[in-house]
């Protein structure tokens, strides 16, 4: 059966900051083919000088009969993926704790930039990280929405223009 592992690991120095994102599209929604078999595991971790700052881990598993029904419910439930096949996460992480006012400004700018058409939200899991998670029916609208938040964060955090990474244009 198809298996995929997506593991991202970031170690940040005390003065370092980063913006990262991950988009996951399940199945082939344009062809009407949902995700109904295989196993996907994701692990995203950010390590600060003081230790682990953030760990995001998820598993979708149709291969193991013990987990297949739970995976099906998670993908269908309004408390889970709500039937949407695309999940996106965008995060701002810092090696040193962010001041409360700065965290609030990043949170506010994320909420203002995230299109209302996307099912998503922004949160601050701890003093090092601000996270946006969103669901969609297609990858493109989600990528555009998270791109708008990324642009807002670049302006807010670093007073930089919203230039796109070259790899996004290929």
Regions found by a protein language model. Name each.
Residues 24-170:
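A structural signal for small-residue-enriched, beta-sheet-centric alpha/beta enzyme cores
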Residues 1-36, 45:
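Internal, conserved structured core segments that host functional sites
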């Amino acid at each position: 059966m198809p298996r995929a592992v997506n593991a991202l690991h970031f170690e940040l120095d005390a003065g370092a900051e980063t913006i990262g994102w991950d988009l996951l599209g399940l199945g082939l929604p344009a062809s009407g083919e949902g995700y109904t078999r295989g196993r996907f595991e994701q692990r995203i971790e950010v390590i600060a000088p003081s230790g682990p700052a953030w760990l995001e881990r998820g598993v979708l598993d149709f291969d193991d009969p013990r987990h297949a029904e739970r995976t099906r419910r998670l993908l269908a439930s309004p408390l889970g993926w709500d039937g949407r096949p695309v999940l996106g996460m965008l995060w701002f992480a810092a090696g040193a704790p962010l001041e409360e006012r700065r965290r609030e400004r990043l949170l506010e700018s994320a909420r203002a930039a995230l299109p209302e058409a996307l099912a998503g939200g922004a949160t601050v899991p701890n003093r090092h990280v601000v996270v946006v998670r969103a669901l969609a029916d297609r990858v493109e609208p989600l990528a555009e929405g998270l791109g708008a938040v990324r642009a807002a964060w670049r302006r807010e955090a670093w007073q930089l223009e919203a230039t796109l990474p070259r790899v996004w244009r290929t």
